[in-house]
Amino acid sequence: RSRRQRQMCIRDSSDIEKTGDFHCSNKKVNQLQSNITWSQRDNFLDIPTDCPQRDERLGWTGDAQVFSWTAAFNRNTALFYKKWMRDVAAESSLEKGVPHVVPDILDSYSSSAWSDVAVIVPWVVYQIYGDKGILEENWKCMHEWVDYIKNNCGENGLWQSGFQYGDWLALDKEESADRTGATDKYMIANAYYLYV
């Protein structure tokens, strides 16, 4: 006979004030929103990490930028992102661009969507909270990122070189080793270039 042991689990995350909520008449949509808010709490511990279900838990910049609007709806992320964007700026340069992960433990740099975090997250914080300070503080990094793209464009003005994640992990492509979707990765890169 085995004894039942009492186990205690402590949830840890950055203390970020709840600011938004969503409810509707559909139980499944409400459950989805609940899952989103819990995932945010589980993944926001000093840096925005990517996956609670794996042991990777890195500060992937693509995940952070694509989730930034939702994160700002759910919680007051202004100070959280302000601190993390300092980390992003410290790891970035005109020569290398912006890392895919911050803190940069992979030494991988400069692809659309991921590196666009340098522009998108400060813009989200400004749009949601009216904080011009985050734009001023990150202006150099923002400009250097856009200049990096411009410097890597061809004569036609399009960004068609270097590594790109493309539509990462999309399921609309025949089996391949590169894990990108069927959408042309440079089309996605140029769409983001226009956006930033």
Language-model region placement:
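Hydrophobic alpha-helical segments typical of transmembrane helices
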Residues: 84, 121-122
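Active-site acid/base region of carbohydrate-active enzymes
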Residues: 11-35, 41-42, 48-100, 109, ...
